[in-house]
From Swiss-Prot:
This is Pre-mRNA-splicing factor cwf25. It comes from Schizosaccharomyces pombe (strain 972 / ATCC 24843). Pfam families: Cir_N, CWC25. The gene is cwf25. InterPro entries: CIR_N_dom, CWC25, CWC25_splicing_factor. It comes from the Eukaryota.
Length: 376
């Protein structure tokens, strides 16, 4: 029971009838296409030869031929629906009159005008309808509302910016005005303080002068009472008698009395001392204050110098300590390198692990030492 050739069951097998039919149809279509191409080539060649012949005729003096497309010059029936080729032939043959043709032409123009008016009326109606539709369009209303909201927001933002700018300007003016007021208040306070101080000094001076006047007045009355008591009157009379005998004339006596009165009216040394102390009382605290300020400044400068000196000494000590440590470490490195014959740290560590590590047993150490001892 044979199944035959299995390739015959494949769709691509060339011995199948349908594949052979498809190949035959493709070959026939190719042949037809080649025939059409050849015919088109012959037509093009004939047309080229014909054009060459016309060119030679025109060059020989023949009539020039106008190259144009005839169908573009064909006149359509544009004179109304009742006009056709037969009517045109009748006019050309003289069977129709010219006034009839003109009358028909006027009627056609009137009809065209009526048609244009109707179209314009339709256009007007369509414009009104369009406007009504636009008014009733919800999307357009939403768009207009959004534009209004956007415009409102822009106006609010502009108003807020203007208000902020005005508030800044107002704060600047108020700050400037307050600073001017503070300066004027400070100036007025200083002036008031100085005026109060001057008034106090004047008042103190007036009080001292009044006290001196009262004291001199009381002394004068006291002297007058003593003079009236009898003792001073007696001595004064004796002095006057001596003076009258001593002075030669009355003018010397008057001069002596006037000089004694002026001397009695002059202020006492105690009052002059108190007045001097009063005037020097205000100047003494200012001098003392300047002296205190200078002493504090000198003390601060001395403290700063001492602090800088102590800081410099500490830095020098730290630098010296660092240099000593570096020298000690460098010395240790040199000693270690000299001890291990200038071997690196890695090799030294490996040798330590090999010869003295925990992984090496006592027997391995004995064998290695024995091997080293037997080595010549």
């Amino acid at each position: 029971m044979g199944g035959g050739d299995l390739n015959m069951k494949k769709s691509w097998h060339p011995l199948l009838m349908r594949n052979q039919e498809k190949v035959w149809k493709d070959e026939q279509a190719h042949k037809e296409e080649m025939k059409r191409v050849e015919q088109l080539r012959r037509e093009i060649e004939e047309e080229r030869q014909l054009l060459e012949l016309h060119r030679l005729q025109e060059a020989a003096g023949g009539k020039k031929r106008k190259d144009r497309v005839e169908w573009m010059y064909a006149v359509p029936n544009t004179n109304g629906p009742n006009r056709d080729s037969s009517e045109m032939e009748e006019y050309l043959l003289g069977r129709r009159r010219l006034d009839d043709l003109l009358k028909d032409k006027i009627e056609d123009q009137n009809n065209s005008l009526e048609k244009t008016e109707f179209i314009a009326l339709q256009n007007a109606n369509s414009l009104q309808d369009t406007q009504a539709k636009l008014r009733l369009d919800p999307l357009l209303a939403i768009k207009q509302q959004e534009q209004k909201q956007l415009q409102t927001l822009m106006e609010k933002r502009k108003y807020s910016l203007d208000s902020d700018r005005k508030s800044k300007e107002r704060r600047h003016r108020d700050r400037h005005h307050r600073s001017n007021q503070d300066r004027s208040r400070e100036r007025s306070d200083n002036e008031q303080h100085s005026s109060d101080k001057r008034e106090h000094s004047r008042r103190s001076y007036r009080n001292d002068r009044n006290n001196w006047r009262e004291r001199t007045h009381n002394d004068r009355y006291r002297h007058r009472d003593k003079y009236d008591s009898g003792y001073f009157k007696k001595h004064y009379d004796d002095d006057m008698r001596f003076d009258q005998g001593h002075f030669q004339d009355e003018r010397d006596l008057k001069k002596y009395v006037r000089t004694s009165r002026q001397y009695s009216r002059s202020p006492s040394p105690d009052f002059r001392t108190r007045n001097h102390q009063f005037h020097s009382r205000d100047s003494q605290p200012i001098t003392q204050r300047h002296t205190d300020i200078e002493s504090r400044l000198q003390k601060m400068q001395d403290n700063a110098k001492e602090l800088d000196e102590s800081r410099r000494k500490k830095i020098e000590l730290l630098e010296k300590k660092e240099r000593d440590e570096e020298q000690f470490l460098e010395k240790e490195r040199r000693d270690t390198a000299r001890k291990w014959d200038n071997q690196g740290d890695f090799i030294r560590n490996m040798r330590k692990e090999i010869y003295s590590g925990d992984s090496v047993s006592l027997a391995d150490r004995v064998n290695s030492s024995r091997h080293n001892m037997l080595r010549p």
